[in-house]
UniProtKB/Swiss-Prot annotation:
Cellular component terms per the entry's GO annotation: cytosol
NCBIfam families linked to this entry: murB, PRK13905.1
Cofactor requirement: FAD
Protein keywords: Cell cycle, Cell division, Cell shape, Cell wall biogenesis/degradation, Cytoplasm, FAD, Flavoprotein, NADP, Oxidoreductase, Peptidoglycan synthesis
Organism: Bacillus cereus (strain ZK / E33L)
HAMAP family according to UniProt: MurB
Protein name, entry field: UDP-N-acetylenolpyruvoylglucosamine reductase 2
Pathway: Cell wall biogenesis; peptidoglycan biosynthesis
Single GO BP term: cell division
Pfam family, one: FAD_binding_4
UniProt-annotated catalytic positions: R176, S226 (proton donor), E296
Catalyzed chemical reaction(s): UDP-N-acetyl-alpha-D-muramate + NADP(+) = UDP-N-acetyl-3-O-(1-carboxyvinyl)-alpha-D-glucosamine + NADPH + H(+)
GO molecular function, one term: UDP-N-acetylmuramate dehydrogenase activity
UniProt family annotation: Belongs to the MurB family.
Length: 305
């Protein structure tokens, strides 16, 4: 299928300005890397997502979904087919102690809404830079909390465009993982069950976690957060630091001097710079300590020709 035809058709389905050709994906990731998307669409509701999926299935066009791009490296060759950004699907409702949040809502914003309603349970998320969908996809967590602790169910869309409601058990949550890495479901919304709390206590905890994050993490540079999962009985950052790798740079990307678990884009780095540095760190740590660091960040897209 000719991508010009795909662009022209989807332009009749989505609002004006929500379909683009050859969109640079570095503009849609936190680390500011990534090549072009053949066709880039940003639906505003579930019906538009279904229309894109059905059209893509009809003509066998590959589809890639993006949240807010906080925990992903898109290769320099970009993404073929249709790239679907979910950043406009951002509704959040509160009923009693239940919050229902759509996939594109920032999990930080949801934690603040919980605070506004004196609800406790999402304080840990006050510094996580991902979307709700991304947070469920990887069972995001920090400071002793994680999404699986508060999620009760979620609405997903299958690869055929069918809506389903799944209970938490169906997610098969583990440490920084869920079943969604192995199926073709799209997370559309999540239902969180929280508890009534005291506003001042909730805010104090969030302020404390924010201070810890700002004092320890290199927020002054683009990054994708923690690059590696925590190995059993150890810390990725400590292993990297003890390997003497802080400040190690490949191209425009370096291991942060502030927190060794982060890799920061300090000088117009590329996706390949990130990938090469990740491999170098993994190889060095394994040689020194016999520990294989497992990536937490996702790598998608095509290599640059």
């Amino acid at each position: 299928m000719n991508m010009q035809e795909v662009y022209e058709y989807l332009s009749t389905v989505l609002p004006e300005g929500h379909v683009k050709q050859d969109e640079m994906l570095k503009n849609h990731t936190h680390i500011k890397v990534g090549g072009k998307a053949d066709v880039f669409v940003a639906p505003t509701n579930y019906d538009e997502i279904q229309e894109v999926i059905k059209y893509a299935n009809k003509y066998n066009i590959p589809v890639t979904f993006l949240g807010n791009g906080s925990n992903v490296i898109i290769k320099d060759g970009g993404i073929r087919g249709i790239t679907v950004s979910l950043i406009h699907i951002t509704g959040v409702t509160v009923t009693g102690t239940t919050i229902v949040a759509q996939c594109g809502a920032a999990i930080i914003d949801v934690s603040r809404i919980a605070l506004d309603h004196n609800l406790t349970g999402l304080e840990f998320a006050c510094g996580i830079p991902g979307s709700v969908g991304g947070a469920l996809y990887m069972n995001a967590g920090a400071y002793g909390g994680e999404i699986s602790f508060v999620l009760t169910e979620a609405v997903v869309m299958t690869g055929d465009g069918e809506l389903r409601t799944l209970t938490k058990e169906a997610f098969e949550f583990g440490y920084r993982k869920s079943v969604f890495a192995n199926n073709h479901y799209i997370i559309l919304e999540a239902r969180f069950e929280l508890e009534e709390g005291v506003h001042e206590e909730i805010k104090a905890k969030m302020d404390d976690l924010t201070f810890k994050r700002e004092s320890k993490q290199p927020l002054e540079y683009p990054s994708c957060g923690s690059v590696f999962k925590r190995p059993p009985n150890n810390f990725a950052g400590k292993l990297i630091q003890d390997s003497g790798l802080q400040g190690k740079r490949i191209g425009g990307v370096e291991v942060s001097l502030k927190h060794a678990g982060f890799m920061v884009n300090v000088d117009n780095g590329t996706a390949q710079d990130y990938i090469d540095l990740i491999h170098f760190v993994q190889k060095t740590v394994e040689e020194k300590f016999g520990v294989k660091l497992e990536r937490e960040v996702r790598i998608i897209g095509e290599d640059k020709e």
